[in-house]
């Protein structure tokens, strides 16, 4: 079937419609790349997969493949011993969550049914629940590591909270002093370069001994770290560095753990993308009440309007 015939049949329009039923970029790409095939055995195998997927949709309801995306770049980095970022690890978790959901779908039959052409795909999916749980235990968001990710991190952050309270108490005492307050643009505590500062009027700079870390665009306000809290700020800064080092260790440990399952993660992605592609065809058939045609060996095609 040449391109002229496909154009007459508005084949690309059909493919665009089909691709809307796929979730993952890979499955969408495969939908758009579909071309007619002539091998009868291959046709019948693909038709059987679509038929079995459609039967599962009728029996179990819709199946979502959200979260199915390639993590190949991250897996390649793991191969060379690199440490993944929190965002990369959460991305892998998103894929494993999809694997868990799709695996559960295959087990949601109310009655035992015979194996079909898709059983092998579902059987080979491994959600890696222990790995998923460990990553989610340690990483709350792309920019947030849980206090309990390690006992060391928990201890560091407890010290940070205590130091923060001491610094704020000292600076609040200064703000609450009527004389000191008269030298401030605002009675607030601000952060500059990771240091606690007070917004001091430029003309009153000499009245608040300390280190200038910044100034306003107009130059009327200087952000000064009072000498009274310099040592406390130094200790807090050291704790921040310790926190950063510990977070890097946590991510390194999680990366090493994830690297142990790289092959299975890659396999999960391949299977999920394939199932996404198959179920997209089934969902499309369901929407338009499609039926499987009967094929012949003569290459004869009869299209009914």
Model-derived features: positions:
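Extended, well-ordered alpha-helical scaffold/bundle regions in very large, multi-domain proteins
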Residues: 121-124
